[in-house]
Structure formats: C-alpha cells, structure tokens
Amino acid sequence: MKTHLLLWGVLAIFVKAVLVTGDDEATILADNKCMCTRVTSRIIPSTEDPNEDIVERNIRIVVPLNNRENISDPTSPLRRNFVYHLSDVCKKCDPVEVELEDQVVTATQSNICNEDDGVPETCYMYDRNKCYTTMVPLRYHGETKMVQAALTPDSCYPD
C-alpha cells in the first residue's frame, strides 16, 4: 500500500513538472536588480471570449529586509520606505541597434530617458556589477586610520 501511494506521489510530481515546463514562456520586460523588481508579460487566451487573446503582466517585487537607507553606509538607519514607480522600473535607456529599411539605427527602448535629470537611481540592493565602498576605521600599531573598504569585493577587485 505504501509503495502504491509512493508511485502515485512520484507520478503527480512528474505530471506537475511536465505541465510547468509546458507553460508559455513569459517575455521579460524589465529586470531591475537594483530595485529588486521583475516585470514579465505573456499572451494568454481570454476566459470571456475564446477568439481573443489578452496580455497578462506579472510584477514581482522582492522587498529586502534589514537594508540600510544608504546601502554604502553600514551605520545608516534601516530602510522603512520602498517606493516603486512602474515607469522607472520598466525604463530601458541602454542604446540598442535596430535595423530599419536596410539601415542600422541606434535607439533606446524608452522615451522617458533624460540624461540631464541628475537624480541617481535609488538602489534597494547591491548591483553586483558595481563597486561599493565605504570608509572604516582601522587600528594598526595603536594608531587609528580611516581606510576605504569594499562592500562588494567581487566587483571591486579583478581576479
């Protein structure tokens, strides 16, 4: 009897795995690691009208607990407010080469890119490709000096 139940359990897991891998792939619209967000989109059949398809958007936000107001300063107070603007999360300002009528053109994927705004993006998590440092006191031979320490050593020091 236990073997019979075990086989049914394995079969249920296998069927679930097949159904999950058979799902339509979602298109990633934005994956902002700095703000811990991901926006995906996929086309699914409408439940109301079988002749129509609708766009389903999924917005995943991971709220990092115990993060600091200033992620580069370990002594700053804990962050209590997290503000997300969908237009900022989905903004893609990196230039992309697009072919238009046998001509390659460089364009951005967003029309709200403004190089002159000067306001840095608020990061709720370390961007692993960016080097973050802070000044820390170091005591050596009875003398205390302020030295710069890497908060993300992998991105600050090449192999």
UniProtKB/Swiss-Prot annotation:
Instruction: Print the keywords alphabetically.
Output: Disulfide bond, Glycoprotein, Secreted, Signal
Transmembrane helix as UniProt keyword: no
Q: Which InterPro entries match?
A: Ig_J
Could you mention a single GO BP entry for this protein?
A: innate immune response
- Location of the protein in the cell: Secreted
Query: So which residues have sugars stuck on them?
Result: N70
Q: Which GO terms describe its cellular component?
A: dimeric IgA immunoglobulin complex; monomeric IgA immunoglobulin complex; pentameric IgM immunoglobulin complex; secretory dimeric IgA immunoglobulin complex; secretory IgA immunoglobulin complex
Q: What is this protein's function per UniProt? A: Serves to link two monomer units of either IgM or IgA. In the case of IgM, the J chain-joined dimer is a nucleating unit for the IgM pentamer, and in the case of IgA it induces dimers and/or larger polymers. It also helps to bind these immunoglobulins to secretory component.
Quaternary structure (record): Part of the secretory IgA (sIgA) complex that consists of two, four or five IgA monomers, and two additional non-Ig polypeptides, namely the JCHAIN and the secretory component (the proteolytic product of PIGR). Part of the secretory IgM (sIgM) complex that consist of five IgM monomers, and two additional non-Ig polypeptides, namely the JCHAIN and the secretory component (the proteolytic product of PIGR). JCHAIN-containing IgM interacts (via CH4 domain) with FCRM (via Ig-like domain).
Q: What is this protein called?
A: Immunoglobulin J chain
Q: Which gene encodes it?
A: Jchain
